[in-house]
Amino acid sequence: MKNTILDKTKLVNSVFSKVYRKYDLMNDIMSFGIHRIWKEKFIDWMNPAQDAKLIDVASGTGDIAKLFSKRSGNMPEITCIEPNNEMFQEGKKNLKFYNNIKWIKAKAESLPVKNNVYDFYSISYGIRNVTDINKSLREAYRVLKPGGRFMCLEF
């Protein structure tokens, strides 16, 4: 079992280390561009207030954080979590002018943040890549405020 988890972790990391520069283009091709509409709708469902706090896990290139920030007047506190070094650097580069967004290199299974902090926990196209879904979900529950919303987008 442990080898399987390690193998998946290595495989996922290797894939994202290779595709990080073209990740958004790949999503455009695989979804025929519809992923952009889905992400807009995802943010619509959140309907974030200016003081909302978001933790975006498996942030990748930062598109969910960017949309969330824009929708709420670039005011909310947003924490982006990304485990892959190349995607982490790409996301930070893409959102370098957003002062309300901070980046942490970490895994969904072990979030280095306090309990009961966030109004929203988002993960888009990432839950399939975590090595321990149950542990990741426990972490989501831990970091959300009571009444906070878990939002997952997959295709």
Regions found by a protein language model. Give the residues of each.
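A short glycine-rich, Lys/Arg-flanked "PGG" loop and its adjoining helix->strand segment in the class I
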Residues: 134-146
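A short SAM/SAH-binding and catalytic strip from SAM-dependent methyltransferases
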Residues: 119-132
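Conserved alpha-helix/loop element of class I SAM-dependent methyltransferases that forms part
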Residues: 32-50, 67
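Conserved beta-strand signature within the Rossmann-like core of class I S-adenosyl-L-methionine
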Residues: 147-154
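N-terminal, positively charged/glycine-rich alpha-helical extensions of SAM-dependent methyltransferases
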Residues: 1-24
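A short acidic, Gly/Pro-enriched loop at the edge of an enzyme's catalytic core
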Residues: 109-121
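A generic alpha-to-beta junction signature in SAM-dependent methyltransferases
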Residues: 46-48, 72, 95, 144
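Class I SAM-dependent methyltransferase SAM/SAH-binding core
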Residues: 53-110
